[in-house]
Swiss-Prot record:
GO terms for molecular function: asparaginyl-tRNA synthase (glutamine-hydrolyzing) activity; ATP binding; glutaminyl-tRNA synthase (glutamine-hydrolyzing) activity. It is an enzyme of class 6 (ligase). Heterotrimer of A, B and C subunits. It comes from Ehrlichia ruminantium (strain Gardel). This is Aspartyl/glutamyl-tRNA(Asn/Gln) amidotransferase subunit B.
Length: 481
């Protein structure tokens, strides 16, 4: 809980979130038009139904139902055997029919939860998950408004939480956790920049210790977690200031101005009766039987929290590494391929530290990396069988990442095989000790830290190729003579 210090009393935030998650599907919710619209030219992925041409009827995409059921199960929801679609009536230029098909009365899933482990295992209740159409997109340029209907009719899952959140830290954790789950089960790509994971935040404040809910404002269409946090912080503090000045709050719908960092009113908040909901007469209700729910449940992959716990339990990974590896489904798959051949801690170290450092620097995903799982396995093979040292492996990896070449070919091309010949290493050690007689004497007089100096000089002479264990062994032997 985050307390807002007021002049008259302390206040707490009451926050509920409505997340609009675009369903991963080839086609739209009620038409055959492509749902892959982000990079398309305006109004090129549009059917007659999407733009409300007279006589066009909706045809339900059953795959979207499966995706919504899968999401509900992953969020511990009750999947309702009966579900139905309704019309939400309002006028806006990017909504050509004058209504949105949604699920107001009978949503597809209810009573779920998301557990926030970093907030003392707090449970944030999921009120409902329902399917609905996305609207088109209004583009305002040069004093004119243009409408792109590509997005109109794309399937959305609206995931509504109870007002259980009490700080922006909890909000950020909730959104990250929810997005991770949806990505992992393959129902939403969670790309906020592209608008496929958007958030409306309902914000109110009340005196600390009160159980009465205050007048809330809804901040619409927030498309980054950073903006969600900034908008909520600003709005909550604005409400506290108004209440302490004796002002009466009005239920409003707001937008967040990311340049000014402040919220502004776009309209008074509507209630349900303002939208005149009624059952859509063109669509049958849904009967979702238990057998179907069981089949969808069987298709669920291992969830990230379960996978993380398994990594910690079975592979003895620390929580930090395990959390990173399960944050993305493709990263987890990469790790699991490597760990079939190599020690889990060794694999995790190379993926989390070395591979991720380079991926993050370039801002690319693991699927775009030149170092595939098979290449990583080969590199670790060379380390384990002592063909190369760990230090040389870093050089090999850097070349792999830049060139896409295999580690074996790089080792051969650059002559990087580890020097394992004891006679050759012994000669180099003798030369190093001969050239540093004063330091040898100091070592024998008790300055044992110089041992590392001798090792470093040998490695320098061999350009890092000498087997470190062999070098250590021979130096110890020579110093005892």
């Amino acid at each position: 809980m985050k307390i807002i210090k007021g002049k008259k009393c302390d206040w707490e935030m009451i926050i509920g979130l409505e997340v609009h998650a675009q369903v991963i599907s080839n086609s739209k919710l009620f038409s055959g038009a492509s749902a892959k619209t982000y990079d398309s030219l305006p109004n090129t992925q549009v059917s007659l139904f999407d733009v409300a041409m007279p006589g066009m009827l909706p045809l339900l995409n059953q795959y979207c139902i499966s995706q919504a059921v899968k999401t509900g199960l992953a969020l511990s929801c009750k999947i309702n055997n009966y579900s139905a679609f309704d019309r939400k009536n309002y006028f806006y230029p990017d909504l050509p029919s004058g209504y949105q098909i949604t699920q107001f009365y009978y949503p597809i899933a209810t009573d779920g939860k998301v557990v926030l482990e970093e907030s003392n295992d707090k449970e944030v209740r999921i009120t409902r998950i329902h399917l609905e159409q996305d609207a088109g997109k209004s583009i305002h340029e040069y004093g004119k408004t243009y409408v792109d209907f590509n997005r109109a009719g794309v399937a959305l899952m609206e995931i509504v939480s109870e007002p259980d959140l009490r700080s922006t830290d909890e909000v950020a954790e909730y959104l990250k956790k929810l997005r991770m789950i949806l990505r992992f089960i393959g129902t939403c790509d969670g790309d906020m920049e592209k608008g496929s994971f958007r958030c409306d935040a309902n914000v109110s404040v009340r005196p600390l210790g009160s159980d009465k809910l205050g007048i809330r404002s809804e901040i619409k269409n927030l498309n980054s977690i950073r903006y969600v946090v900034q908008a909520i912080e600003y709005e909550a503090n604005k409400q506290v200031m108004a209440l302490e000045n004796g002002e009466e709050l009005i239920q409003n719908t707001l937008l967040f101005d990311v340049i000014l960092g402040e919220t502004r009113v776009i309209r008074n908040k509507e209630d349900a009766h303002d939208y005149r909901y009624f059952p859509d007469p063109d669509l049958f209700s849904l009967e979702i039987d238990d057998q179907y729910i069981s089949e969808v449940k069987l298709s669920l992959p291992e969830l990230p929290m379960q996978k993380r716990d398994r990594y910690i339990r079975d592979f003895k990974l620390n929580k930090y590494d395990a959390d990173i590896l399960v944050a993305d489904r493709d990263v987890a798959a990469y790790f699991e391929e490597v760990v079939q051949k190599h020690d889990a801690k060794l694999a995790a170290s190379w993926i989390v530290c070395d591979l991720f450092a380079r991926l993050n620097k370039l801002g690319i995903s693991i699927n775009e990396s030149a170092v595939k799982a098979g290449d990583m396995i080969q590199l670790l093979d060379l380390i384990v069988d002592k063909t190369i040292s760990g230090k040389i492996a870093k050089q090999v990896f850097a070349i792999m990442f830049e060139s896409g070449k295999s580690p074996i070919s790089i080792v051969n091309e650059y002559g990087l095989k580890q020097l394992d010949d004891s006679d050759s290493v012994s000669m180099i050690v003798e030369n190093v000790l001969e050239n540093n007689k004063d330091k040898v004497l100091q070592y024998k007089q008790g300055k044992e830290k110089l041992f590392g100096y001798f090792v470093g000089q040998v490695m320098k002479e061999t350009q890092g190729k000498a087997n470190p264990e062999l070098v250590n062994s021979i130096i110890k032997e020579k110093l005892q003579e």
